[in-house]
């Protein structure tokens, strides 16, 4: 069985085809980074218009890459939320229309479930149960996962997500959009320990996060110490270390509270090398395992939507003729498969 996946929740147009026997057959991705760079962030209207231009050509390219035709597709999966409402509507409308025209089921997919399941695309996928750290520009959550759709929210950010804090702090440091990866690159040139940032909410019980204060702390540190190149690198290092340590401390608590031995990391920030190294070291000490997707599947992509669509289709999930999206959609509301 082959599923076409369509991802248009924000500023990447991702199209992929997944076969339940052969695996990933095609993966096409277009990033709008250059389109939004001059504005310092994603402009929703521009994102929607660009998805309109790119979605159908990328579907054609994916079919060509897989050497398939429309008649070879058994279902169409699309991101139905959460995300930017206009961007979501583009993918949902195209996906639902193609499913109707091709007389195949349409499958609405939760964007964060796509991220959560992305490590399943690797050669060594995790078994259930596990703790999932979903860490991206819009979300920072710890989830207890005991099966498909069996998700319990353990903790989440009460203000900025980790990825959002990375981007905002990068802007304070004079870095271009998207700033997160550029901040990490700058941090690699920084001196550890010159500046010490707080580890928010680690001095109290619980698994919630707070990252907005780190941005303020960074702004004050820049104002007090100047902004020569080395100082900026040292501040970037201190900021990244604070975020990584905070995530690691909370992951450790989540593992202790659940008793699970496996940790899955997903979302755009999961591509951060420092975070990967620290969590791998922690799990080795705990005699556990850590899993994550390859870097190109950490950010938004169609492959994770095609795979999640396959999983949901086998569980009997399909959409009616209407086009419905949910810009806000708690992961815990998904039914068990």
Curated annotation (Swiss-Prot):
Alphabetic keyword roster: Acyltransferase, Cytoplasm, Iron, Metal-binding, Transferase, tRNA processing
UniProt catalytic activity: L-threonylcarbamoyladenylate + adenosine(37) in tRNA = N(6)-L-threonylcarbamoyladenosine(37) in tRNA + AMP + H(+)
Cofactor: record remark: Binds 1 Fe(2+) ion per subunit.
Gene3D superfamilies on file: 3.30.420.40
Keyword tRNA processing: yes
Location within or outside the cell: Cytoplasm
GO MF assignments: iron ion binding; N(6)-L-threonylcarbamoyladenine synthase activity
InterPro entries, alphabetized: ATPase_NBD (IPR043129), Gcp-like_dom (IPR000905), KAE1/TsaD (IPR017861), Peptidase_M22_CS (IPR017860), TsaD (IPR022450)
GO cellular component: a single term: cytoplasm
Enzyme Commission number, as recorded: 2.3.1.234
Cofactor(s), by name: Fe(2+)
Biological-process GO terms, alphabetical: tRNA threonylcarbamoyladenosine modification
Protein name per the record: tRNA N6-adenosine threonylcarbamoyltransferase
Species per Swiss-Prot/TrEMBL record: Salmonella typhi
Name of the gene: tsaD
């Amino acid at each position: 069985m082959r599923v076409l996946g369509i991802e248009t929740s924000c500023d990447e147009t991702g199209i992929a085809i997944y076969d339940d026997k052969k695996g990933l057959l095609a993966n096409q991705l277009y990033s709008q980074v250059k389109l939004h760079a001059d504005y310092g962030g994603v402009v929703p209207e521009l994102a929607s218009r660009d998805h309109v231009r790119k979605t159908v050509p990328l579907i054609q390219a994916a079919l060509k890459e897989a050497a398939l035709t429309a008649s070879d597709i058994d279902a169409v999966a699309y991101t139905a939320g959460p995300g930017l409402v206009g961007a979501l509507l583009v993918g949902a409308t195209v996906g639902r229309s193609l499913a109707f025209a091709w007389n195949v089921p349409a499958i609405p997919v939760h964007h964060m479930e796509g991220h959560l399941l992305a490590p399943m695309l690797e050669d060594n996928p995790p078994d259930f149960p596990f703790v999932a750290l979903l860490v991206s520009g819009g979300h920072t959550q710890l989830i207890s996962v005991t099966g498909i759709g069996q998700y319990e929210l353990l903790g989440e950010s009460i203000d900025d997500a980790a990825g959002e804090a990375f981007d905002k702090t990068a802007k304070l440091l004079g870095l271009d959009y998207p700033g997160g990866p550029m901040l990490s690159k700058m941090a690699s040139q920084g001196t550890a320990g010159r500046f010490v940032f707080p580890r928010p909410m680690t001095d109290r019980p619980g698994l919630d996060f707070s990252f907005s204060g780190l941005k303020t702390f960074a702004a004050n540190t820049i104002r007090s110490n100047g902004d020569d190149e080395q100082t900026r690198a040292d501040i970037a290092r201190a900021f990244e270390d604070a975020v990584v340590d905070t995530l690691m401390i909370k992951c450790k608590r989540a593992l202790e509270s659940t008793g699970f031995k496996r940790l899955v990391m997903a979302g755009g920030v999961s591509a951060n090398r420092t975070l990967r190294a620290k969590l791998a070291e922690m799990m080795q000490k705990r005699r556990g395992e850590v899993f994550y997707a390859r870097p190109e599947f950490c950010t938004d992509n169609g492959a994770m939507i095609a795979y999640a669509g396959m999983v949901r289709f086998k569980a009997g999930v399909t959409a009616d003729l209407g086009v419905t999206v949910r810009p806000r959609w708690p992961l815990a509301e998904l039914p068990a498969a």
